[in-house]
């Protein structure tokens, strides 16, 4: 990621391919089960406490917080309105995961659902659900 953006306006301090990448996004499923097989839901992860809380272009790393909040809100709202009114928004973590810490552009890790939990996976295997989530991320 940093090599792609290196030399561009978003990462001017590193050498690279000079591609001004606006953001990095890691799409994951999480592990975990519940005793009653209820929805585990969606978690957003970002990280601010590195590089003096700034990206390479001087922008605040709190942009990742705002981006994570917007994307997670879109996803959960669309899932609740179209599929499951009780879909869980698990919160947002400001944690030092590699994928959130290293990129020099705003970054989000999305843990959409639990791949070990039937209540989550009955949606996760539905192509319409996948499209809805993808659209929610994009908009």
Name these PLM-found stretches:
Residues 56-57:
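Short histidine-centered catalytic/ligand-binding loop motif
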Residues 1-6, 29, 72-81, 138:
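Sec-exported extracytoplasmic/periplasmic mature domains
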Residues 60-93:
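Active-site-adjacent substrate-binding region
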Residues 1-40:
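Catalytic-core regions of hydrolytic enzymes
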Residues 29-53, 83-139:
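Active-site-adjacent mobile loop/cap segments within catalytic or ligand-binding domains
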């Amino acid at each position: 990621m940093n090599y792609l953006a290196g030399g561009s306006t978003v990462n001017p301090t590193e050498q690279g391919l000079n591609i001004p990448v606006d953001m990095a996004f890691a799409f994951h499923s999480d592990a975990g089960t519940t005793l009653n097989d209820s929805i585990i839901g969606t978690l957003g992860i970002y990280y601010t406490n590195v590089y003096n809380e700034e990206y390479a272009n001087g922008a605040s790393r709190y942009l990742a917080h705002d981006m994570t909040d917007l994307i997670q809100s879109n996803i959960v709202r669309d899932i609740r309105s179209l599929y499951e009114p009780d879909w869980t928004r698990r919160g947002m973590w400001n944690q030092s995961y590699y994928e959130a810490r290293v990129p020099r552009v705003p970054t989000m890790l999305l843990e959409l659902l639990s791949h070990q939990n039937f209540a989550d996976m009955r949606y996760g295997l539905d192509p319409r659900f996948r499209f809805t989530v993808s659209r929610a991320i994009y908009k």
